[in-house]
A protein has these predicted regions:
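A conserved acidic beta->alpha catalytic loop
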Residues: 31, 39-48, 90
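Short aromatic/hydrophobic "clamp" motif used to bind/position activated sugar donors
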Residues: 86
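Membrane-interface aromatic/basic loop that binds lipid-linked glycans or pyrophosphate carriers
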Residues: 279-351
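Cell-envelope/extracellular polymer assembly enzymes that use nucleotide-activated donors
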Residues: 2-5, 24, 34, 197
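Catalytic core of nucleotide-sugar-dependent glycosyltransferases
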Residues: 214-222, 228-256, 268-302
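Short, well-formed alpha-helical segments that are part of the catalytic scaffolds
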Residues: 13-27
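Donor-binding/catalytic cores of nucleotide-activated saccharide
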Residues: 70, 91-209, 217-233
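Glycine-rich, basic loop-to-helix element that forms the pyrophosphate-binding segment
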Residues: 65-81
């Protein structure tokens, strides 16, 4: 019976959330688990709570470290892991009791198993929009198409297979041998985007994976979520991430398909930065947002990559409109477009 190493980084988590998370793991119907809780120097009583659970369950290992961030917490746990498989869970989330069992049922001949999630906010719960069928991928061309979609972050057409849960570290069952043999780690120098880079590198070494079209993970949405907060280094970090993708994927220089895919990603990130950085309500320099955005668009990789985007391969949709405006440097129109879309989403109650 193969073992799963369940890795949970812990830092400043509400006691109720942390307990719910740990108990949802310890009560799994698949029992051969190694539960690694990493107390990342949390200043509250999170470390003590983890220790109490370890006293009750011999499968629980607690690593106490000075605060080094979520990436180092995961990396240190990977070093300690002994299971044939690894899965990651965020300490403020929880999982369905049969998550590990269903994932292990699909592990045979696979290098990775992926599944869907619930999005939970207070008493509301909805299933994350994802690919709507079970899927087993062992065809090299289809695997490449899915990886290109991952690199691009958006679909070129409505017929493409897109699985958003491929991007983050949760909702995954990874083969530890692939991680170990290829020395795949989370980049601790990055404050965001390190999880997607980890997955993209991992995907380079897989031959087959299975997607389970069933929500088995509960992702908690709340005010403290990092996705909703302003990060002063967002523009710089995003630029560094784009450069790391360039380094990770040599085919960007040898394949027109990969080159255009990368260029599209640069454009998508540029648009993302309008809302997450330049026009974010907590940006203290928001009054200079337009001028600073223009300066960034004249820097690399943005300037060359966005100019080189081939829009002909895309269906006409909202993404194509954004990229067209960026490609032809209609920056004032891009800002107006963003504000219009944002206003409509607020009216509709879309986050």
């Amino acid at each position: 019976m193969e073992k799963i190493s369940v890795i949970v980084p812990v830092y400043k988590i509400k006691e109720q959330y942390l307990k719910e998370c740990i108990e949802s793991i310890s009560k799994q119907t698949y029992s051969n688990l190694e539960i690694i809780l990493v107390d990342d120097g949390s200043p509250d009583n999170c470390g003590e709570i983890c220790d109490l659970y370890a006293e009750k369950d011999s499968r629980i290992m607690v690593l106490h470290q000075k605060n080094q961030g979520v990436s180092m917490a995961r990396n240190n746990a990977i070093q300690k892991a002994t299971g044939e498989w690894i899965t990651f869970i965020d300490a403020d989330d929880w999982i369905e009791k049969n998550m590990c069992e269903l994932a292990m049922e699909k592990r045979d001949e696979n290098d990775m198993v992926v599944w869907n999630m619930y999005l939970n906010k207070d008493a509301n719960q909805q299933i994350k929009k994802n690919y709507e069928k079970d899927l087993s991928v062992d065809d090299e061309k289809l695997l490449e198409k899915i990886n290109l979609n991952f690199l691009r972050t958006i679909s070129l057409s409505k017929d493409e297979i897109r699985i958003p849960t491929l991007e983050g570290p949760v909702c995954h069952l990874y083969k530890r041998s692939i991680i170990k043999e290829n020395n795949i780690r989370f980049d601790s120098s990055l404050k965001q985007g390190e999880d997607k880079l980890f997955n993209y590198e991992y995907h380079k070494y897989i031959k087959r994976f299975t997607y389970i079209n069933k929500p088995l993970y509960h992702y908690r949405l709340h005010g403290e979520s990092t996705t909703h907060t302003f990060f002063a280094g967002n523009a710089d970090t995003s630029t560094r991430i784009l450069k790391k993708y360039y380094e990770l994927e040599p085919r960007i220089n040898t394949s027109e398909t990969y080159r255009n895919t990368y260029c599209v990603r640069v454009g998508v990130i540029a648009y993302f930065l309008i809302g997450k950085y330049f026009l974010h309500p907590d940006n203290p320099n928001r009054k200079n947002a337009f001028r600073e955005f223009k300066i960034l668009m004249n820097e690399e990789p943005y300037k060359s990559a966005i100019a080189a985007i081939d829009l002909r391969v895309m269906d006409l949709n909202l993404n194509k409109i954004k990229l067209w405006l960026l490609k032809y440097r209609k920056y004032r129109s891009v800002f107006l477009y963003y504000n219009l879309v944002n206003m409509i989403q607020k009216i509709r109650g879309v986050k």
